[in-house]
């Protein structure tokens, strides 16, 4: 069994990061030029890390699955990025951000990592402003803020509804500068297939050229994985179609333990599924919950009429509307954390109060905000989001629909929860290093900062914190002992064996020649994952899900059809490789969910809930990080290793968003 060591520094939580930086090992400028680092991924975490490491003088090889880093899924983030600047003078602080993040994660995050995240958050904003990121500003010129779920202060910095795009352009500009000066070599249209281990350390990768189809070897003194989450294991999610977990799973198979895979975030404000031919879902920013109010009809007969298309939401007067989040959680209202809002929407729809033809939707209404602020102000805040919603649904949320008794009602949006983010990921210690020496994981692909539920606007914060301000310190602590190690040759037998194994897998997939397409099997996988490993989980359902996942694996191995050949570009082959890893990932999520006999954050076991239907934790038996060690892709279940959680600065208690 693999032994894990979180390497959390001694001392008070507020001093750990400062003390770490004061005593860590450093690499001098001359030696940095002799050290090579591979960074896999060019989203916010990967681009910021590659740019920072290049700026420091290391030689960096950066791998991008797309034609350009500007196409990373980070670009889709809409609402904002958190930081504890307290510009609004509303009581925010580093400690408050730290506390809200731990509480939002249902007390299942590593305390020391979360405090460090809150501590460096302010530097992220300064860095991005210096890069020219056009954050929204007040009339007087100071940076503006808005609120997000799980907080009672305004700490979210934003660039209209395109924050991820603007932050990515900032990171991309920094990366481009390093590419231009020669410290970073960028490889576009390459996808990592395996990590190469030499004498127990990560020393390189095998990557597939997605244009030529060829496998290539790359060597370095350290490898950094920044490839995002595994939400597409569910087939339908808000993730970009190319998002996958192949790099992470390849590390898992080589000995990097995987932490808390059951912690999957389901976002409450997504455009509902419109048919069985859909391949992706669209997120509507959490920022909309600042001014939008979520409701369903009070009367079931009104819900039935809505489902039949006999009436519209604007036909229902104020007194017949149930603003259920405001009713249940008066202290936070519509800005409760995502897991709470998602379960509440599911409960209302399961009770028969859904508002579309499938019964799986609730309303997000801006009538009150438009009447209070005026349409111009609302459009200034959310105009591009309104446009996006109208383009997809042909409904304009800013259009007056009806006036009842002098009250103006506008077209409400329809929303429903969907898979969005994964809090689980590759296990890392305080230094962001995995259980494989020299292999680091940053951003969404590690588990470190969000516990069982991520707060809105904290994904961008973590990605940039890891890339700009954490990894550049911690990786030196490892590389300081590698300065006498010469550059590696890719002719080493370990590289040849890794490439041979990847090629054998590709040959095996191409030789199946069955009848089912990749997308067909992926849809079946997604159905099983959503049905049994989705918002509501039970022991019986999870056991059934695991059994069905094994059948899906067998179908993949015996009945998959991949057109074309392995030479040259073959998109279906690339998708098949990713799907095989999604199946492994799905089993891992299900095993973890079955083991965790409690409800916490995004993991909700229906057997473990309070009388009010809230998540019921079991701190006595499950106050730990669940780390899973790979045992094979056959019938063997992974081995559980526990990292006990230690809280020194925060009292662990039941989450309360009602008062």
Predicted regions and their residues:
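Short beta-strand "acidic-cap" motif of Rossmann-like dinucleotide-binding folds
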Residues: 58-64, 259-260
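Glycine- and aromatic-enriched mobile tails/lids
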Residues: 15, 19, 24-27, 31-36, ...
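Core beta-strand elements of the Rossmann-like FAD/NAD(P) dinucleotide-binding domain
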Residues: 33-35, 213-222, 435
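Glycine-rich Rossmann-fold phosphate-binding loop(s) that bind the pyrophosphate
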Residues: 41-44
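Conserved N-terminal glycine-rich FAD pyrophosphate-binding loop of Rossmann-like flavoproteins
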Residues: 67-99, 265-269, 276-280
């Amino acid at each position: 069994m693999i032994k894990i060591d979180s390497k959390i520094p001694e001392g008070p939580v507020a001093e750990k990061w400062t003390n770490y930086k004061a005593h860590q090992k450093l690499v001098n400028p001359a030696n940095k030029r002799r050290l090579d680092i591979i960074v896999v991924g060019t989203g916010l975490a990967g681009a910021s890390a590659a740019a920072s490491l290049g700026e420091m003088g290391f030689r960096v090889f950066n791998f991008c699955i797309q034609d350009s880093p500007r196409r990373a899924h980070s670009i889709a983030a809409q609402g904002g990025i958190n930081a504890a600047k307290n510009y609004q003078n509303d009581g925010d602080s580093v400690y408050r951000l730290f506390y809200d993040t731990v509480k939002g994660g249902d007390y299942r995050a590593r305390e020391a990592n979360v405090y460090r995240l809150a501590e460096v958050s302010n530097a992220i904003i300064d860095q991005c402003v210096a890069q020219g990121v056009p954050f929204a500003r007040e009339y007087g010129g100071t940076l503006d803020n808005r609120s997000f779920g799980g907080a009672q202060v305004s700490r979210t910095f934003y660039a209209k509804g395109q924050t991820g795009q603007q932050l990515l352009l900032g990171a991309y500009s920094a990366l481009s500068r390093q590419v231009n000066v020669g410290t970073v070599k960028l490889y576009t249209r390459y996808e990592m297939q395996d990590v190469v281990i030499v004498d127990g350390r990560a020393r390189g990768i095998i990557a597939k050229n997605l244009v030529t189809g060829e496998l290539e070897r790359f060597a370095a003194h350290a490898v950094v994985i920044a490839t995002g989450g595994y939400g597409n294991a569910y087939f339908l999610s808000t993730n970009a179609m190319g998002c996958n977990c192949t790099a992470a799973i390849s590390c898992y198979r080589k000995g990097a333990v995987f932490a808390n895979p059951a912690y999957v975030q389901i976002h409450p404000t997504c455009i509902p599924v419109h048919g069985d031919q859909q391949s992706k879902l669209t997120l509507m920013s959490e920022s909309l919950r600042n001014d939008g109010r979520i409701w369903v009809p009070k009367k079931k007969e009104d819900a039935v009429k809505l489902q039949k298309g006999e009436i519209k939401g604007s036909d229902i007067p104020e007194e017949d509307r149930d603003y259920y989040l405001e009713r249940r959680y008066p202290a936070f209202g519509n800005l409760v954390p995502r897991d709470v809002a998602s379960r509440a929407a599911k409960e209302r729809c399961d009770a028969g109060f859904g508002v579309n033809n499938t019964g799986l939707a609730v309303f997000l209404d801006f009538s009150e905000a438009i009447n209070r602020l005026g349409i111009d102000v609302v459009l200034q805040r959310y105009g591009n989001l309104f446009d996006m919603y109208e383009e997809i649904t042909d409904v304009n949320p800013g259009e007056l629909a009806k006036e009842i008794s002098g009250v103006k009602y506008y077209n409400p949006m329809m929303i429903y929860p969907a898979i969005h983010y994964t809090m689980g990921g590759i296990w890392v210690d305080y230094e962001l290093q995995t259980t494989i020496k020299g292999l680091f994981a940053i951003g969404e692909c590690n588990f470190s900062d969000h516990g069982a539920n991520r707060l809105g606007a904290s994904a961008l914060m973590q990605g940039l914190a890891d890339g700009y301000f954490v990894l550049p310190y911690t990786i030196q602590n490892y590389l300081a002992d590698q300065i006498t190690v010469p550059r590696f040759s890719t002719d080493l037998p370990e590289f040849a064996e890794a490439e041979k194994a990847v090629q054998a897998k590709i040959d095996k997939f191409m030789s199946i020649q069955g009848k089912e397409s990749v997308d067909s099997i992926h849809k079946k996988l997604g159905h099983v994952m959503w049905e049994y490993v989705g918002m509501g989980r039970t022991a019986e359902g999870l056991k059934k899900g695991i059994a069905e996942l094994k059948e899906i694996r067998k179908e993949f191995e015996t009945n998959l059809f991949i057109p074309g050949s392995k030479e040259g570009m073959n998109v279906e082959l690339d998708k098949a490789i990713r799907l095989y890893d999604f199946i492994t990932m799905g089993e891992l999520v299900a095993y973890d969910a079955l083991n965790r006999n409690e409800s916490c954050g995004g993991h909700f076991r229906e057997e473990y809930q309070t009388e009010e239907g809230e998540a019921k934790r079991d701190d006595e038996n499950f106050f730990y990080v669940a780390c899973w060690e790979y045992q094979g892709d056959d019938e063997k279940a992974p081995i559980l290793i526990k990292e006990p959680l230690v809280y020194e600065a925060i009292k662990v208690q039941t989450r309360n968003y009602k008062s």
